[in-house]
Every structure is written in C-alpha cells, then in structure tokens.
Amino acid sequence: MQAAQSLYENGYITYMRTDSTNLSEQAVSAARSQITSLYGPDYVPEKVRTYATKSRGAQEAHEAIRPAGESFRTPEGLARELDGDRARVYELIWQRTVASQMKDANGLRTNIRFEADAGERGTAVFTTSGKVITFPGFLRAYVEGSDDPDAERGDQERLLPPLSQGQQLPVES
C-alpha cells in the first residue's frame, strides 16, 4: 500500500482506496488511444467496455485505480523514474487498465493424440491437451498470474503450437 500511496502522491495514479471498476470517459479515451498506438486498431472493441462492481459494500465514490492523466505513460516510459515496488505496482495498474478496454482473446481448445510404432511392444500412445491462441486480444497487455514464478505448472494452461493431422514431430527424450 505504501508503493501505491507514493504513486498517488506523486501523480502517477488516481486515488487508490476505492473498489470502483468504473473508468472516466477521459481514462477510457486514453486507454483506447494507447491500445491503438501500441497494438493496432484490431485490439480496440467497437463499444467501450464497462464492468459492474461485484461487492455490495464497494467504495465507489472515486473511479477505478488507473494511471493518472489524459494520456497514460507506459511502464517502460517510467523506468528511470520508478524503482522496485513502485514500478511493479504501476505496471500492474497500467496493464489491467489497458487490458480492460481491449478485445477478448480467442483461441481453440485442442486435444492431441500421438501414436508411434514401438516395435515389438506395439503402439505407444501419447495424449496432451491445451489451447492455441488465435487472437491474443487483452493478453497482449496482461496475463493473470504470469508474474508468479511459484505458480504450479500443472495448474496453468499449456499453449500448443498449431499442428496438422499427419504432421511428423521430433521426439526428445
């Protein structure tokens, strides 16, 4: 909370003691403009995205926590001004604000079954499942949990490369 307080006091973010999910028109415009310049117009949805607060006792007198100003400074643009926790907190706020105004990601869930001749032992069968991202959408700006090095690998989705039936694959042991 000290890092966020410092960011607020120095004009980097808006008021941070709020539960609000609402962004001002100015913030939405800044986010959409930045999305277009960083990722291209294909990442901006036609309609502004709005979100409802899920908690009954939410403190919504202020708008959502976001980068301050009429245009947002990127975390990279502030690298020389912010250090340690302040840089990480700002990056998280920036990522979530920008991602909140981007199109959804699209992908295909895939189940793959590999069969290989195992000689005298018959056929070896291997299976895996995962997803292939066909359009990254908001994932270009923010992936939930990607900054958690201790996350259980088994709990994370695996990204699979595009494959075609009959394609030969290298085997590694």
Which ranges hold each PLM region?
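Extended, well-ordered alpha-helical scaffold/bundle regions in very large, multi-domain proteins
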Residues: 1-59, 65
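An acidic- and aromatic-residue-enriched active-site/binding cleft used to recognize and process polar
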Residues: 5-6, 12-13, 18-20, 70, ...
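Short hinge/gating elements
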Residues: 13-20, 64-81, 171-173
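Long, highly charged, low-complexity internal segments
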Residues: 1, 40-41, 54, 74, ...
